[in-house]
């Protein structure tokens, strides 16, 4: 599966069970990458994808449901238990730090991923967003 997520520079994803930030340009970029594929999302993320012009499947545990080649977007889930199923990571990073109490729970390099590419673009809420792609 191909797991995508967004986080602050320090790996922070949530604070007090709330997303630390968001940007609709990330959703658009992910939709373009996934093209004709379906993106699995959690109930927590459903509001972000409500008006998306592409297909999503909402699940209480999208990491469990997704198979090889499927896209998954996570915000409030730990990837570590599903790392062996993960073939690619798409990580969107804000150029800022935010208070957080839920962080990305792996180091891609330590889990055997290799950095593939980086792309910077402007968002609606963030001047600079960096998309990193890591592959096995």
For every predicted segment, state its role.
Residues 1-136:
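Enzymes that bind and transform nitrogen-containing heteroaromatic metabolites
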């Amino acid at each position: 599966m191909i797991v995508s997520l967004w986080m602050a520079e320090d790996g922070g994803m949530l604070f007090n069970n709330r997303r630390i930030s968001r940007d609709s340009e990330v959703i658009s970029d992910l939709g373009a990458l996934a093209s004709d594929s379906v993106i699995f999302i959690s109930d927590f993320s459903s509001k972000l994808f409500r008006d998306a012009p592409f297909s999503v499947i909402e699940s209480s545990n999208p990491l469990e449901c997704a198979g090889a080649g499927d896209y998954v977007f996570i915000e409030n889930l730990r990837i570590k238990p599903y790392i062996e199923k993960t073939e690619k990571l798409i990580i969107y990073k804000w150029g800022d730090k935010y208070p957080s109490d839920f962080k990305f729970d792996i180091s891609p390099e330590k889990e055997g991923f290799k950095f593939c590419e980086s792309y910077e673009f402007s968002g609606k809420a963030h001047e600079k967003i960096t998309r990193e792609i890591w592959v096995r």
